[in-house]
């Protein structure tokens, strides 16, 4: 179900030599954080699943991680066992109220080392309300600044659009991780997303870089999945991460339980894939 499960253990799903990524050494101290935006304007590509489970995997390796739920659907919040509709104050208040204290809005999760800045449907109003703000693309970057020294990684779970909220996430980020479903239709939107990233880099955030494209929902039993993955590697080369996330019912089961897959089913191949992804990103320098 994941790239490790091939006929030749030395090759990945598309025949590339598959490196072994070592376990990350412990950190002597924490912070300042590297901010990673998880973006794809197409929904249903495993973006929130990746945000939650990669964050939990990094926390398992001793990294302090903050997830910023930046989707009005609040899926990352729900997936971590927090009911966003019951919250009076969320990331929306942080964006709209200059005197809002980010520390008071951060929620601790059941996973040690993993915190959450939650969102709910209120966030949908921010897109319109921010239009009249000065430096409206940089509001999230400003609001995150007070906690960057408290974490090693901040992961922003973006909504499936390329609107002002996503531009805010890209302006606040050092890197972008692009989850890409192994379906032909999913390929079509990546060029537009890359174009948006380049515009933000040119106009708002020159440090922004693509940390990697992550193939998700891969099913090695289907020719379709294998062909899509081959096309992605042909098109994007080394930007495509070695780790591939397989399709499994364990992800929705874990989400319903409000737990990352690494806690819900730690021995499952899906949990091991996200641990491998965490090791790969550390090895690539995307995470300390």
Regions found by a protein language model. Give the residues of each.
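P-loop NTP-binding core
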Residues: 1-288
């Amino acid at each position: 179900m994941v790239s490790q499960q091939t006929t030749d253990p030395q090759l990945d799903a598309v025949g590339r030599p598959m490196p072994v990524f070592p376990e990350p050494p412990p950190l002597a101290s924490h912070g300042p954080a590297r901010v990673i935006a998880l973006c794809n304007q197409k929904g249903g590509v495993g973006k929130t699943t990746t945000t939650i489970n990669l964050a939990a995997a990094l926390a398992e390796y001793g990294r302090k991680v903050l997830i910023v739920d930046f989707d009005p659907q609040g899926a990352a919040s729900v997936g971590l066992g927090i009911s966003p509709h019951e919250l009076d104050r969320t990331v929306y208040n942080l964006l709209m109220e200059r005197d809002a204290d980010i520390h008071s809005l951060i929620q601790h999760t059941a996973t040690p080392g993993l915190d959450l800045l939650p969102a709910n449907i209120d966030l949908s109003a921010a897109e319109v309300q921010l239009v009249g703000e000065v430096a409206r693309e940089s509001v999230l970057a400003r609001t995150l600044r007070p906690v960057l020294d408290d974490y090693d990684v901040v992961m922003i779970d973006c909504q499936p659009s390329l609107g002002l909220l996503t531009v805010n996430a890209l302006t606040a980020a050092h890197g972008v991780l692009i989850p890409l479903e192994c379906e032909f239709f999913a390929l079509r939107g990546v060029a537009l997303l890359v174009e948006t990233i380049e515009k933000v880099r040119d106009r708002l955030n020159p440090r922004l870089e693509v940390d990697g494209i992550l193939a998700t929902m891969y099913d090695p039993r289907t020719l379709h999945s294998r062909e899509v993955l081959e096309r992605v590697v042909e098109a994007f080369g080394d930007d495509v991460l070695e780790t591939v996330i397989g399709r499994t019912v364990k992800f929705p089961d874990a989400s319903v339980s409000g737990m990352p897959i690494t806690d819900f089913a730690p021995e499952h191949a899906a949990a091991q894939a996200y641990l491998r992804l965490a090791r790969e990103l550390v090895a690539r320098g995307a995470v300390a």
